[in-house]
Design a protein with these regions (language model features):
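Residues forming the flavin
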Residues: 1-450
Length: 450
């Protein structure tokens, strides 16, 4: 989206192809999914206008080193289109799913006013290249929705971390990819007052806003265990995108007024783990380690299939004390559930190999020494958190280009970003390279900066 905006403002007329619906229709469809369990594989928490970030906490902080001002530019653009100006100066900027939805819509309108096009329910289903394998190949056209051929010499591949069918198509067409380490785990819910008291020394947060945390631990087997996408005053949501598979995520509104804090507690996994690792859904027998680009995706899918079965289509949940004992919970304790989507009690120990469960528990106990009560027995766990980052990387050179010329892998799905701000920064960087190479179709629009 940011790549398209930058190109449009510089006089280019980009065509944005979005497999899902516009943000308004998408929001309605996601709400129906949470209520009924009826999943649309093309328009859901992962796919549709704004991508996965639209249904998240809307965190805007990033660890990416930025010497070119792109981070500041992302925040400035967000305020230009409706974001609170405070995100320009607060330590941990946050925008919220409700505000981000409006901003995304406004950016799309701006792109269209400048001559760009945004086509919804338009999934790229194939890539047409010219040149023989092993020689200088380049993109020639895209196939949309299985039939429409769209000629293209320059394609920005910003597909997100969950476009598994697109990854499969890219691999089948000989576009290089490689497996990448990521992390998997469970969402944990605590009362927000517990986190406030630990961080502020008092249960009520006042003008400080609900407290957050960022925790890391090293397990006895040297695996990293850490909190991820912590959502103060938020909800755990069903974030599935494939039938028969289930994944969760965290989400907060702008006011972060929910009763609970939640975060993913995740354990690192590497390409060496993907092949032959036992999960509740069995072992992958078709893995071609160590360079099998799809191994991580198959690993994710096995975990998500197990989660779907454990919850019978609902989010499988368990109290932490029961997780340690390997028994199904019979009810809640002092933590009230805060979910979007149906949930059911299950034994989440059946999700993971024992090595990952052990590392998870070591991390939880360690975090209990940092935040008193973090490892309380009635903390609510939900699974599975499997979409923490892309399981693949699509190689690109210093000019942001794939070995297949004309394809520019970009953002989180390509393995070069991890969150809203870093993905937007990568989009801007990609646009800068395209602008450097090609002349615009119309005069550029200058935007006053503040």
């Amino acid at each position: 989206l940011f790549c398209g905006l930058m190109l449009a403002r510089k006089g280019y007329m980009p065509i944005l192809l979005e497999r899902g619906e516009d943000v308004d229709a998408r929001t309605d469809r996601v709400a129906r999914f949470w209520e009924t369990g009826q999943l649309d594989p093309s328009s859901n928490v992962q796919f549709g206008e704004g991508g996965a970030g639209t249904f998240s906490d809307g965190k805007l902080n990033t660890l990416v080193k930025d010497t070119f001002g792109r981070n500041r530019e992302v925040l400035r653009i967000l305020t230009e289109f409706g974001g609170d100006p405070s995100i320009l100066y607060v330590n941990k900027p946050h925008i919220g799913t409700d505000v981000l939805s409006r901003i995304v819509k406004s950016i799309r309108t701006e792109i269209e006013k400048l001559g760009g096009q945004v086509l919804f329910q338009s999934q790229v289903t194939d890539f047409v290249t010219e040149g023989e394998p092993g020689e200088s190949r380049r993109i020639k056209a895209l196939v949309v929705n299985g039939s429409q051929v769209l000629e293209a010499e320059t394609v920005v591949l910003a597909i997100g971390h969950s476009a598994r069918d697109t990854f499969e198509t890219l691999l089948a067409r000989g576009i290089p990819m490689e497996p990448k380490a990521f992390a998997v785990g469970l969402r944990v819910q605590h009362p927000q007052t517990l986190i406030n008291e630990s961080q502020y020394g008092m249960k009520e947060c006042g003008e400080l806003g609900p407290a957050s945390y960022k925790l890391t631990w090293k397990a006895s087997d040297e695996r990293g265990v850490y909190s991820f996408c912590m959502c103060p005053g938020g909800y755990v949501v069903n974030a599935s995108s494939e039938p028969g598979r289930l994944a969760v995520n965290g989400m907060s509104y702008h006011d972060r007024a929910g009763e609970n804090a939640n975060s993913a507690i995740i354990v690192t996994v590497t390409p060496e783990d993907f092949c032959g690792m036992e999960t509740g859904a069995g072992t992958d027998q078709g893995c071609e380690a160590p360079g099998d680009a799809m191994a991580g995706i198959r690993f994710q899918r096995r975990l998500e299939e197990t989660a779907f079965c454990l919850g019978k289509g609902n989010i499988p949940i368990q109290l932490y004390g029961d997780f340690k004992e390997g028994r199904v919970s019979e009810g809640f304790g002092g933590v009230n559930p805060a979910f979007r989507g149906g949930y059911a009690f299950a034994n989440l120990r059946e999700l993971f190999p024992e090595s990952l469960s052990r590392a998870f528990m070591e991390g939880m106990e360690g975090f209990g020494t940092m935040i008193r009560g973090f490892d309380r027995p009635d903390a609510i766990l939900a699974g599975i958190e499997s979409r923490t980052s892309s399981p693949v990387r699509i190689p690109r050179d210093q000019g942001m280009e794939s070995p297949v010329k004309g394809i520019f892998p970009c953002g989180e799905g390509a393995g070069y970003a991890g969150g809203i701000t870093s993905a937007a920064m990568d989009g801007i960087k990609t646009a800068e390279e395209i602008i450097r190479r090609y002349s615009p179709l119309r005069p550029s629009r200058t935007v006053a900066k503040t």
